[in-house]
Amino acid sequence: MPRRTFTRRSILAGAAAAGAQLPLAARVLSQAPPGEQITPALVEAARKEGKVNFYTAMEINVAEQFSKLFEAKFPGIKVRVERSGAERVFTRIAQEYSSKIYNVDFVNTTDAAHVYVWKEKGWLQPYVPADVAEHFPAAYKDKDGQFMTARILFVALAYNTNLVKKEDAPKGFEDLLDPKWLGKIVKAHPSYSGAIMTSTYAIARDLGWRYFEQLAKQKVMQVQSGVDPPKKVALGERAVMADGADYIALQLKAKGEPIELIMPAEGAPIVNSPNALFKQAANPNAARLFHNWFCTAEGQEKLVQITGQYVAHAKIAPAPGRPPLSDIKIMKDDPEALLKMADEIKTRYTAIFKV
């Protein structure tokens, strides 16, 4: 039997067939529940479950390191990390739910449009950690309490400092169209990576699809995940990256690798990465506990320390050496618009790059 293909359009069509008539922007399911503290009762209930299934697009080493901090904080609860590109995570959850397999407890995705789909389907469990209620700005949390931005990253450029002089490095996306970069560029794919899907939408909106059409003529090395281009550049397999996760480039530089991050002159595409709980979670209390700790000042501070990423928690400062978010020229995201465009973006991108 051929494997069923799941797209955002097909998943939302299922929701409409089940009686979902309102557009996403108009749908208010309920008032957000009050903020909840981590209590001894929650910890005990989580320990009885013993584990949490965490689906994420975080770089695997980061996800595992962060999860181990939680496990050390709450002994007896294991985090089972299921890491893949956000678009693959999205497809996997759809496939599992279509087969009535409810394995995912808790998710963090780099494609914020995903949570709108899951919310529309009625798959998400409203839950607001106390710190989210008190310290997360309204722009970073769902009004119904079903998801919130737990980490913020940027899709940026980078170059290998052994292969490219600082004065010759690209300053922005348009510079990559210079013939001197022919065969020297690596980039990730929006059909795999949520961060790259988000940035592809933003770049196509602001620069036009003609940018990608011209970039495709540069004999670009195509990889899957948004965490891969910085690694390829650091290894010297390509001189520059056309897109990739900023935090991975910074981590590699901190380890002494020959890589330098560039925030594009046109604006760096921002990627809001939300957390969400699933109603059908097999380990609901462990999921609540992990999600709650993730959003505490402690959890958010640890994430900044490990990754150098930004967080939504108002009490947590950026990592040393990183400017305030307000000082960064941002290419804005738009998850609700992306929700309508994602399938078209995948098709058009594949046609342009032939991959």
Can you say where each PLM-predicted feature lies in the sequence?
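A ligand-binding cleft/hinge motif common to bilobed small-molecule-binding domains
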Residues: A113-V117, A239-P258
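Short, polar/charged alpha-helical segment
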Residues: E36-R47, K51-G76, L157
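Periplasmic-binding protein-like
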Residues: L24, I152-L153, W181-S191, E213-A216, Q222-V223, K255-K279, F294-P318
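Extracytoplasmic ligand-binding site segments that recognize negatively charged/polar headgroups
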Residues: T56-S67, V79-Y97, Y102-P230, A234-E237
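N-terminal export signals
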Residues: R4-S30
